[in-house]
Amino acid sequence: MVSIRLPDGSVRQYEHPVTVAEVAASIGPGLAKAALGGKLDGELVDTSTVIDRDASLAIVTDKDADGLDIIRHSTAHLLAYAVKELYPDAQVTIGPVIDNGFYYDFSYNRPFTPEDLEKIEKRMQELAKKDEPVTRRVVSRDEAAGYFRSIGEKYKAEIIESIPQSDEIKLYSHGGFTDLCRGPHVPSTGKLKVFKLMKVAGAYWRGDSKNEQLQRIYGTAWTKKEDQDQYLHMLEEAEKRDHRKLGKQLDLFHMQEESPGMVFWHPKGWALWQQVEQYMRRRVNEAGYLEIKTPMIMDRSLWEASGHWQNYRENMFTTESEKRDYAIKPMNCPGHVQVFKHGLRSYRDLPLRYAEFGSCHRNEASGALHGLMRVRGFVQDDAHIFCTEDQFISESIAFNTLAMSVYKDFGFDHIDIKLSLRPDQRAGTDETWDRAEQGLRDALTACGLTWEELPGEGAFYGPKIEYHIKDALGRSWQCGTLQLDMVLPERLGAEYVAEDNSRRRPVMLHRAIVGSMERFLGILIEHHAGAMPVWLAPYQAIVLNIAESQAEYAQSLAQSLQKQGVRVAADLRNEKISYKIREHTLEKVPYLLVVGDKERDAQTVAVRARGGVDLGVMPVEAFVERLQEDLRSFK
């Protein structure tokens, strides 16, 4: 007798071992038809999996996130099947599920073209319509390697030969195609109805640039066509909002080959940067932080003491001078500990909050660089809090409150919070970790925040809170962190004199709100589609004269507004007013102030708000009041 416990708590009993598919059929024909897999005692399995023991089981359908993953994984195999049918000389490698889709890497003697992708996608549709059953068989490592060698698939054979000999190998087949995979997969190809191939990119075998270059075909797959259409529309919107495109269009910044991963900020881009930095500086000053500045280059000995030289050196830029090795700092923490150590600290001095807009450099692989989102040189809104064990919860509460307020001011209302908990390999005792993790939970609870816990995802030196902001397109970006560190103060000898005159290690909290300023600006640009809020806009207004006779008034008006704190410029070019309006509209300036003879004579302005909204003619003072109202609504 086999007892199966279902998600609703009910128990079904069977006289003999049953498959997941048979359990689904015993519940109802609709569920049997919809079943894509099962979750057997928490493990995702195929519908053909035999259950021969008492267990809990949830039937997975296309309404479940796991079901969508199964569909995407199976569609990756369908892609490989189609490629092998159309291009028999192509060799298959790997094809995992990724966010919103999948990819598969191939070795082939020529690049795949857009026309090839169309042919492949069409063949995938034909194969899916055949509704061929997907079967699984388990074989030995040697049998699997021998099979793939015999059909000329050297990459698959190499993968298998790297697996321990004692491990069982699963092979999945449908039609004339067999692939190595852990599974699970859909019961038949007819379940794969909504998919699209997206693009081809280069990749290296096993991710190593020393190996052969492969071709990676990306695709997306969904349970419903409406979901795919929505996703494709989001991609179109994302392309329009691409910060690299808008950076050029709005004349904010550029990057060039002579300085990979570094940003050349143009005047308008730097004005935007300054607004963000000055805002952040004001907020941390109000929160009781002390701003410091630490050296960009420090001796190897400090990085050895901190552990970075041993564990992070490949990501560091190093140099040598007078037979001494130095590193350009990849992070600010060791420097902040040096400031803390300079002089004897008392418990009365704590908490000490050091903030720095620190310039850091990391030797990222050139292939990983991506506009402002992934750079080699960046500035962090970094800060470190040195406090006692009794203070770290209240400091965490204060930081949570500050971070949530900052995100809201920048226009981000949806924040996902994740709490990374102790890994298997870690410093400190279980009791210390218990206090640290519970303290961070208590701080989040005190702020009325909800969070997801990630067991095993914490750093070896302490638990961490991550703050993921969602942009206008629903994309998630991890920006802020609050990291408790149980190791660095000890490594670098940080201590304070406690109330009983003993020497103790401070609790160290690493924290950032926006993280990399460059990356955050890229996120901001895409979130607002380049149309920055008035308080952030590089230019809040542009004064436009219609003819030469109003140039002097336009110039004096711009100067007057500038003295009142408005970021403004005058466009006095001898161009048609329609041309100037169109140009500055494309630059997404919040307000265009048009002056003709009537406005000059009456000392007024014709105001156009962003989006082509005509606000009519008004006194200059009325416009300034409107602008101030915009800024007050932000503050």
UniProtKB/Swiss-Prot annotation:
InterPro entries: aa-tRNA-synt_IIb, aa-tRNA-synth_II, aa-tRNA-synth_II/BPL/LPL, Anticodon-bd, Anticodon-bd_dom_sf, Beta-grasp_dom_sf, TGS, TGS-like. This is Threonine--tRNA ligase. Its cofactor is Zn(2+). GO terms for molecular function: ATP binding; metal ion binding; threonine-tRNA ligase activity; tRNA binding. It is found in: Cytoplasm. SUPFAM superfamilies: Class II aaRS ABD-related, Class II aaRS and biotin synthetases, TGS-like, ThrRS/AlaRS common domain. One of its GO terms (cellular component) is cytosol. It comes from the Bacteria. GO terms for biological process: threonyl-tRNA aminoacylation. It catalyses: tRNA(Thr) + L-threonine + ATP = L-threonyl-tRNA(Thr) + AMP + diphosphate + H(+). Residues 242-533 are annotated as: Catalytic. Its EC number is 6.1.1.3. Homodimer. Binds 1 zinc ion per subunit. Zn(2+) binds at residues 333, 384, 510. Keywords: Aminoacyl-tRNA synthetase, ATP-binding, Cytoplasm, Ligase, Metal-binding, Nucleotide-binding, Protein biosynthesis, RNA-binding, tRNA-binding, Zinc. CDD domains: TGS_ThrRS (cd01667), ThrRS_anticodon (cd00860), ThrRS_core (cd00771). Gene3D superfamilies: 3.10.20.30, 3.30.54.20, Anticodon-binding domain, Bira Bifunctional Protein, Domain 2, Threonyl-trna Synthetase, Chain A, domain 2. Catalyzes the attachment of threonine to tRNA(Thr) in a two-step reaction: L-threonine is first activated by ATP to form Thr-AMP and then transferred to the acceptor end of tRNA(Thr). Also edits incorrectly charged L-seryl-tRNA(Thr). Belongs to the class-II aminoacyl-tRNA synthetase family. Its main location: cytoplasm. Residues 1-61 form the TGS domain.
